[in-house]
C-alpha cells in the first residue's frame, strides 16, 4: 500500500519534464506550478497549506495540471488514497443543502488530514459551487498551527474554475492583436485582474469569499486559450499514447476540424484540447 507523505522526495526536474512534455501553450501555469509545488514540498515547516486556483476555459489543461501534480507526489496519482477530488455538480448538487455540505466537507477534510498531513484536495467546477460553501474550509487554509488538534499546514488545495476565463482571453487576444508573442504575457498582466474578477463574479464559487478577502489563495494560475499549433501538439501526444503511428496529415486534419474564435481571425480553439 502507498504511504502517506509522498512516493519520494519530489524531484523538481521530474515535475518540470512532465509539465514540458504534457502541458502545451501554458508558459505561465507551468512556471507558477513548478515553483509553487516544488518550493512548498521542500519546506519542512510551511506556515499554511498550499492553495492554487487554476482558471481558464475547458480543455486548456487545468485538470491535466492537477493530475500531473498528484502523480509527482503520489504513485497512484488521482487514484491515491491521499488525493481527494470534489466535483461541484456531483458532490454538492443542491443549493438547499449547503449547510449540510459545509459540515460534511469539514469532517471529510479533518478526517483525511488527521490520517495523512500531506493530503491533496482538488475542487473541480468551482464556478458551479454554491456561494458560501467554499468558505467552510477557510479555517483549514489559514495561518493556524493547529485547528482542533490537527495541523493542516502540509496539505495542498487546488481549485479548478472557468471563472475569469473571459478576462484571460481578453488579455491573450490583446497581445495577439498587437503582434506580440503569447510567451510575452506575464503573470502580473493577469493575476490581480483575475482575483478581482473571480471575487466579484456571482457564479465563481468564490463570490465575495473570505478566502480571497484574507489572501488565503497563494496563487491564481491563468490557463491561456490554445492556438492551432497547441492542438496539433495535443493530438500528436494522444496518438503516441494510444500506440498509433504519428501521421502529420491526420494531425492537421483533426486540428482543422476544431472550431476557433473570434469567428473571422480563428485564433483560439473553442474547446481547447
UniProtKB/Swiss-Prot annotation:
The EC number(s) this enzyme carries: 3.6.4.-
Pfam families named among the record's database cross-references: TOR1A_C, Torsin
Membrane topology: Peripheral membrane protein
GO biological process, one term: neuron projection development
Molecular-function GO terms, alphabetical: ATP binding; ATP hydrolysis activity; ATP-dependent protein folding chaperone; kinesin binding
Compartmental location: Endoplasmic reticulum lumen; Nucleus membrane; Cell projection, Growth cone; Cytoplasmic vesicle membrane
Binding site for ATP: 56-63
Keywords for the protein's UniProt record, in alphabetical order: ATP-binding, Cell projection, Chaperone, Cytoplasm, Cytoplasmic vesicle, Cytoskeleton, Endoplasmic reticulum, Glycoprotein, Hydrolase, Membrane, Nucleotide-binding, Nucleus, Synapse, Synaptosome
Major subcellular site: endoplasmic reticulum
Quaternary structure and interacting proteins, as annotated: Homohexamer. Interacts with TOR1B; the interaction may be specific of neural tissues. Interacts (ATP-bound) with TOR1AIP1 and TOR1AIP2; the interactions induce ATPase activity. Interacts with KLHL14; preferentially when ATP-free. Interacts with KLC1 (via TPR repeats); the interaction associates TOR1A with the kinesin oligomeric complex. Interacts with COPS4; the interaction associates TOR1A with the CSN complex. Interacts with SNAPIN; the interaction is direct and associates SNAPIN with the CSN complex. Interacts with STON2.
Family: Belongs to the ClpA/ClpB family. Torsin subfamily.
Task performed by this protein: Protein with chaperone functions important for the control of protein folding, processing, stability and localization as well as for the reduction of misfolded protein aggregates. Involved in the regulation of synaptic vesicle recycling, controls STON2 protein stability in collaboration with the COP9 signalosome complex (CSN). In the nucleus, may link the cytoskeleton with the nuclear envelope, this mechanism seems to be crucial for the control of nuclear polarity, cell movement and, specifically in neurons, nuclear envelope integrity.
Name of the protein described by the UniProt record: Torsin-1A
Species of provenance: Cricetus cricetus
Gene encoding the protein: TOR1A
